[in-house]
């Protein structure tokens, strides 16, 4: 094989013939052999079938190789590497087997890849839409094809400026320019060879030293400086290049002076010469300095111009930018430009010039019936209309006036008065004159464009072109169809010849408005006239007949101030009235005395009236009849700079007309429309209700609403409907005639719903009215509790629910405060009820004595609140006599009919699907349902019922006859489950609530501690007042023998109970606790008919109304013993009713003195059993509930085994009550701590029923304070910890082991 191997030309036939190769060659061969070894290894892994196969023809070379391998160790390194390289070369040749194996590989194994490549080529072929007709190559762009065609035509438009070389592309010529380096640019062409550069520098320095030495000896002559200036002048003016064959370096070259300021320095100091700016050398003559700079600092000079550079790269880049670009633009060299001018081929459509006919032919494909959108200014054509639209921005930007006069920046200069460029396009001048009309700041300057073209100041040629341009407009103005006159330009007789020109003019108008919106007087005129005519012609309701269109199209509109109406002014000056519809629309727009936009269409008409007042007197045929000021008030005639100032000024006239137009508000229809909005007090009441309830529709009848104070004016099925209360007090200041006109126009619905301020469009007039409040700043929806005001009713509703929820939902005082203590929080007691008046009116039509408008709650309902339970007063320390007197003063028997009527009305409301929420639900239940239940229970009470003379026992006896099953059904029907947690509404026992700045502050009744957090108040009471009492010993030293009984009852904590004495029997309270968590769930499951139930209508202590006090101690395992006053919640004896069985097993120490101590003494006395009973117990049960209006325990539920098991009773805080059960010995053991000084007098116990009058009056308040302290339970905190009871009537949780067996 005679082929050369891949190893740098080493022959493959004689590997051992060249053992004398040199080291560098061997190193190169070794590197190449390594590379070949890597390639062959990679190929062997990639293509295993291409491994070298045994070939019989190559046995001899193989034997030679074996022979060569044997002495390989004895050969030199060079010969070994050569043999290895040749062997690798033969392996590659054998494995690939030439091009045949490669072809088989491509055809056989990689067909999938080849198919993919073919698909890619097909896609690329599709993307390349421009094929070459000669060679078949395809290109993506036509410009690339035109460059490719130069290879076939031989055109080379780019010529080298230094030689005769030409290139078809600019990049090729730049590559050629790199060859002209280091003297190759031509000898003597402004540069000195590198070998002569150092010689010239040394020569210059020697000459400089000699001159300096001579100058120090000889004085300078005075005639040298004029000579230098005289020589500088001709050199500066001579800019001719040196001839190409000139190579003498001594000739001065006219290079510009690098620092002309040296001339002035030379004139001042005659001894100094010319200084070089690069090396600071001095020369006496200018020629010497130029020669010095050209030789040393700027040796590279351009032969085509005067440019000189210090580096060669700068000179080449200068030639590429300056000279090649110029040559490429011409398409030919500088010498051949005149010769090829006859061979130019120009496009007749766009005027582009080509050097070859073939280029012109390819260029003509662009104009193949596709560029049909032509620009009327420059003549360019486009395929798509949006291309033309974007192109028009170029002309508009050129026409815009960006710079004003520097002396008067505030004065607007009309475009008609500006000097235009001499070479500006004729169409551009016409458009600028058209635009100058829109930019006129006043009427006087509007005639400038007409004077420019009317006085013959234009040349004849321009007049002729303008006449051709304007002739289609004038001819089309007479032949405009009637339908086209409805448009804006049709009314103005400005119909353009083409659609593109129309777009152009509209863009010019918009651009004019953007440049100076204040002084764009005629632009505002054009818009105002267009709105007036569009409103008059295009509205369906205001569509005029054909005979009215032509007079309106040729007339002007003038506002007559005396008659206050618009009149049409003809071309001859005659006046006539406008059509009724058009007059109505403009008159309504002129009513600016309604700032609240009573008519939702007034916003657009106000803008229209602004245009009509100043601009509609402008004759539609031309600008010659304008007489009004730009922005003039129609009432007083004052002129303002902007339209917004006129709108603000119009409010002054509105205030002046208030006194004159008050008589018009007496009408019934207007009164019904306005409702109680004129009365400030009633307006505040109506605004304090739900925004939806005060809205009134325009279709309100004469007698359809209630005109009383605070009542709803009209049933509003649409809460968002516009109303007088939404608009405000000044909404109805217009006269009755204007009101009728507004209603009639609203029914027609013919006005535009576009905002005159920002241009937004709205579907309905109501949305426009609401939107206009943003611009006017009107906020009619005011909050009755703070200074907030909103533009929409939804904003006020959100504000009320976000910041005043407790005031909006609470019908009476805040939860936790007695209703008769109005001095504590008057604002909460006067909070309004948010009830829809239309629903209440339908429910209470048959109730003449019920009035919801007088206040948040009527007097009857307040009395009902007191009658339903006087426990509120008792819980805060009020005597029972006061509450009973208030109960008697309410005159319940006389009001019983009202309660039944209210109950029926409430049922009617509930049956209609109305659901009261939150505190309003509890409010309605506590006043309506309680009266119904009282009436029912009074009828069901047996005649032989036990006589009860205590005031609080009466309600408990009535409620005791009700069954628990009935109680559950009633609560499920009228009292839905309220899962909301409102920690700020209720109060803790032992604390009071005051509301300041919408924040509920809880104050401790025992100290001066105040906080806004109920959790902190609960912790404060637990740590400082209730908990401290537990940790103290008994102050009187009384020993209580209750350890053994406490140990016998495992897991039970016995509360201190009170045993009645001989003369007065008081029921004791014993709270029983089971610390086992299993019994927590067993307690409610084991309830029977004798189980205690909570009161029907709760106060702040009732869990059904407020779960906080009852759930607070649940985490400590404390359970309230009873939630009621007259009904003990424990399992009492069934067979005993008024007898007391004292147990003598426990020693009882009763002091004989009675004393009133402070609340701290009470708390200290009340915890004496803690030292004995808390040793063997995990939890302590302590509670004395203070609610006297709760369900009493039926007498049949008394426990039979009262002596063996402890019974629970309740300590009544207000008055002595009859004995309801027996006191167990377990309860007697803890009795003595209650007979300490200040609590109970020492009296002999006696059997029988005591009289309530026998109770000492001084006992009521200490017992009330004690009950407040002891009723402080741990159930409320569980509401915040997720431990709240799900049932609303959570009373006591009884102990199954202590209850009687049923």
Curated annotation (Swiss-Prot):
Segments for region (Disordered): 1-26, 650-736, 804-832, 855-897, 935-988, 1133-1261
Keywords: DNA-binding, Metal-binding, Nucleus, Phosphoprotein, Repeat, Transcription, Transcription regulation, Zinc, Zinc-finger
One cellular component (GO) term of this entry: nucleus
Primary residence: nucleus
InterPro entries per UniProt: Krueppel_C2H2-ZF, Znf_C2H2_sf, Znf_C2H2_type
Coiled-coil spans in chain: none
Biased composition (Acidic residues): 1161-1171, 1179-1188
UniProt feature, compositional bias: Basic and acidic residues: 657-676, 935-973
Zinc finger (C2H2-type): 130-152, 158-180, 274-297, 300-323, 345-367, 373-395, 631-653, 753-775, 781-803
Domain of life: Eukaryota
SMART domains: ZnF_C2H2
Residues that bear Phosphoserine: 828-829
Residue ranges with Polar residues bias: 677-698, 869-883
Example of a GO MF term: DNA-binding transcription repressor activity, RNA polymerase II-specific
Compartment(s) of residence: Nucleus
Tissue: Expressed predominantly in the brain, while a weak signal is also detected in the heart and testis. Expression is abundant in neuronal cells of the cerebral cortex, hippocampus and hypothalamic area (at protein level).
Composition skew (Low complexity), residue ranges: 1198-1212
Family: Belongs to the krueppel C2H2-type zinc-finger protein family.
PANTHER family given in the database record: ZINC FINGER PROTEIN (PTHR45925), ZINC FINGER PROTEIN 536 (PTHR45925:SF2)
Function: Transcriptional repressor that negatively regulates neuron differentiation by repressing retinoic acid-induced gene transcription. Binds and interrupts RARA from binding to retinoic acid response elements (RARE) composed of tandem 5'-AGGTCA-3' sites known as DR1-DR5. Recognizes and binds 2 copies of the core DNA sequence 5'-CCCCCA-3'.
Name of protein: Zinc finger protein 536
Provenance organism: Mus musculus
């Amino acid at each position: 094989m005679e082929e050369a191997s891949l190893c740098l030309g080493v022959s493959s036939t004689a590997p051992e013939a060249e053992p004398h190769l040199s080291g560098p060659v061997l190193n190169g061969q070794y590197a190449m052999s390594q590379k070949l070894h890597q390639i062959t290894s990679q190929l062997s892994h990639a293509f295993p079938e291409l491994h070298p196969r045994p070939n019989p023809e190559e046995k001899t070379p193989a034997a030679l190789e074996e022979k060569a391998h044997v002495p390989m160790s004895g050969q030199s390194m060079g010969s070994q590497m050569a043999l290895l390289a040749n062997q690798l070369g033969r392996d590659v040749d054998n494995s690939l087997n030439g091009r045949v194996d490669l072809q088989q590989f491509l055809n056989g194994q990689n067909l999938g890849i080849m198919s993919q490549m073919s698909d890619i080529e097909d896609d690329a072929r599709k993307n390349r839409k421009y094929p070459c007709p000669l060679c078949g190559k395809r290109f993506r762009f036509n410009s690339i094809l035109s460059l490719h065609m130069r290879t076939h035509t031989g055109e080379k438009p780019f010529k080298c400026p230094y030689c005769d070389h030409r290139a078809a592309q600019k990049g090729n010529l730049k590559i050629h320019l790199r060859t002209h380096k280091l003297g190759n640019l031509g000898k003597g062409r402004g540069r000195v060879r590198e070998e002569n550069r150092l010689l010239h520098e040394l020569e210059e320095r020697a000459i400089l030293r000699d001159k300096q030495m001579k100058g120090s000896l000889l004085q300078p002559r005075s005639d040298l400086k004029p000579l230098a200036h005289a020589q500088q002048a001709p050199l500066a003016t001579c800019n001719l290049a040196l001839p190409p064959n000139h190579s003498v370096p001594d000739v001065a070259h006219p290079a510009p002076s690098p620092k002309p300021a040296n001339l002035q320095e030379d004139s001042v100091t005659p001894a100094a010469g010319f200084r070089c700016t690069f090396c600071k050398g001095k020369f006496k003559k200018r020629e010497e300095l130029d020669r010095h700079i050209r030789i040393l600092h700027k040796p590279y000079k351009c032969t085509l111009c005067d440019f000189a550079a210090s580096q060669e790269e700068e000179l080449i880049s200068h030639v590429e930018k300056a000279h090649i670009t110029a040559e490429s633009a011409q398409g030919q060299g500088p010498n051949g430009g005149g010769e090829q001018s006859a061979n130019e081929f120009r496009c007749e459509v766009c005027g582009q010039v080509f050097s070859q006919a073939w280029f012109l032919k390819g260029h003509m494909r662009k104009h193949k019936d596709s560029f049909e959108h032509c620009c009327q200014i420059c003549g360019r054509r486009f395929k798509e209309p949006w291309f033309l639209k974007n192109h028009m921005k170029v002309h508009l930007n050129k026409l815009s006036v960006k710079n004003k006069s520097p002396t008067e920046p505030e004065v607007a200069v009309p475009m008609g008065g500006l000097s235009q460029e001499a070479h500006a396009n004729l169409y551009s001048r016409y458009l600028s004159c058209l635009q100058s009309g829109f930019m006129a700041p006043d009427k006087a300057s509007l005639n400038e464009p007409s004077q420019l073209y009317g006085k013959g100041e234009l040349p004849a040629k321009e007049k002729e072109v303008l006449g051709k341009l304007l002739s289609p407009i004038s001819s089309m103005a007479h032949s405009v169809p009637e339908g086209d006159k409805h448009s804006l330009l049709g009314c103005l007789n400005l119909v353009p010849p083409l659609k593109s020109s129309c777009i152009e003019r509209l863009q010019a108008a918009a651009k004019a408005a953007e440049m100076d919106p204040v002084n764009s007087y005629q632009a505002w005129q054009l818009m105002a006239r267009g709105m007036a005519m569009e409103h008059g012609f295009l509205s369906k309701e205001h569509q005029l007949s054909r005979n009215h269109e032509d007079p309106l199209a040729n007339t002007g509109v003038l506002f007559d101030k005396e008659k206050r109406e618009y009149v049409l002014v003809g071309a001859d000056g005659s006046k006539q009235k406008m059509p009724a519809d058009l007059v109505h629309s403009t008159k309504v727009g002129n009513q600016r005395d309604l700032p609240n936009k009573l008519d939702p269409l007034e916003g657009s008409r106000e803008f229209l009236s602004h245009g009509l007042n100043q601009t509609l007197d402008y004759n539609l045929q031309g600008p010659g009849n304008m007489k009004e000021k730009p922005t003039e008030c129609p009432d007083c005639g004052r002129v303002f700079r902007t339209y917004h100032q006129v709108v603000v000024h119009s409010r002054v006239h509105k205030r002046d007309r208030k006194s004159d137009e008050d008589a018009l508000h007496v009408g019934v229809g207007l009164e019904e429309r306005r409702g109680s909005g004129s009365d400030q007090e009633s307006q505040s009441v109506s605004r304090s209700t739900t925004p939806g309830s005060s809205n009134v529709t325009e279709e309100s009848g004469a007698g359809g609403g209630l005109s009383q104070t605070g009542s709803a004016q009209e049933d509003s099925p649409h809460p968002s409907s516009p109303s007088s209360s939404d608009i405000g007090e000044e909404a109805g200041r217009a006269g009755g005639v204007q009101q009728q006109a507004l209603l009639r126009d609203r029914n027609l619905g013919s006005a535009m719903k576009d905002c005159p301020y920002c241009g937004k469009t709205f579907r309905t007039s109501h949305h426009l009215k609401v939107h206009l409040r943003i611009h006017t700043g009107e906020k009619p929806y005011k909050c009755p509790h703070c200074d907030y005001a909103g533009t929409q009713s939804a904003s006020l509703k959100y504000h009320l629910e976000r910041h005043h929820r407790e005031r909006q939902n609470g019908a009476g005082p805040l939860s936790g405060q007695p209703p008769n203590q109005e001095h504590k929080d008057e604002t909460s007691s006067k909070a309004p009820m948010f009830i829809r008046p239309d629903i209440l009116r339908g429910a209470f039509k048959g109730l003449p004595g019920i009035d919801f408008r007088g206040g948040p709650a009527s007097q009857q309902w307040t009395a009902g609140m007191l009658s339903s339970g006087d426990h509120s007063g008792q819980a805060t320390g009020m005597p029972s006599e006061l509450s009973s007197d208030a109960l008697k003063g309410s005159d319940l028997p006389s009001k019983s009919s009202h309660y039944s009527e209210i109950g029926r009305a409430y049922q009617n409301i509930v049956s209609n699907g109305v659901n009261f929420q939150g505190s309003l639900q509890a409010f309605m239940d506590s006043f309506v349902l309680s009266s119904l239940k009282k009436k029912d229970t009074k009828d069901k009470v047996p005649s032989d019922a036990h006589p009860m003379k205590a005031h609080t026992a009466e309600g408990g006896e009535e409620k005791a006859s009700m069954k628990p099953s009935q109680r559950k059904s009633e609560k499920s029907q009228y009292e839905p489950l309220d899962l909301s947690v409102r920690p700020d509404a209720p109060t803790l026992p032992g604390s009071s609530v005051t509301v300041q700045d919408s924040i509920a502050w809880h104050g401790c009744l025992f100290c001066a501690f105040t906080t806004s957090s109920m959790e902190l108040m609960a912790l404060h009471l637990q740590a400082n007042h209730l908990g401290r009492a537990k940790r103290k010993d008994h102050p009187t030293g009384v020993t209580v023998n209750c350890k053994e009984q406490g140990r016998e009852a495992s897991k039970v904590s016995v509360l201190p109970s009170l045993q009645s004495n001989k003369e007065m029997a008081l029921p004791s309270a014993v709270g029983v606790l089971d610390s086992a968590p299993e019994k927590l769930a067993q307690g409610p499951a084991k309830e029977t008919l004798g189980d205690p139930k909570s009161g029907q209508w709760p106060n702040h202590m009732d869990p059904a109304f407020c779960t906080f006090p009852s759930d607070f101690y649940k985490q400590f395992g404390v359970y309230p013993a009873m939630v009621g006053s007259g009904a003990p919640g424990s399992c009492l004896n069934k067979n005993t009713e008024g007898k007391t069985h004292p147990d003598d097993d426990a020693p009882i120490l009763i002091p004989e003195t009675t004393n009133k101590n402070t609340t701290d003494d009470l708390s200290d006395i009340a915890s004496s059993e803690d030292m004995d009973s808390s040793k063997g117990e995990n939890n302590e049960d302590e509670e004395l509930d203070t609610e006297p209006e709760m369900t009493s325990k039926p007498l049949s539920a008394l426990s039979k085994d009262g002596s063996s098991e402890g019974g629970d009773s309740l300590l009544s805080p207000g008055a002595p009550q009859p004995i309801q059960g027996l006191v167990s010995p377990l309860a007697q053991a803890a009795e003595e701590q209650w007979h300490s000084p200040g609590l109970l007098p020492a009296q002999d116990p006696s059997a029988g029923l005591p009289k309530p009058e026998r109770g000492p009056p001084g006992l009521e308040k200490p017992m009330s304070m004690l009950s407040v302290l002891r009723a402080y339970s741990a159930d409320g905190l569980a509401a915040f910890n997720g431990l709240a009871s799900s049932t609303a009537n959570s009373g006591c949780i009884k102990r199954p082991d202590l209850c009687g067996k049923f």
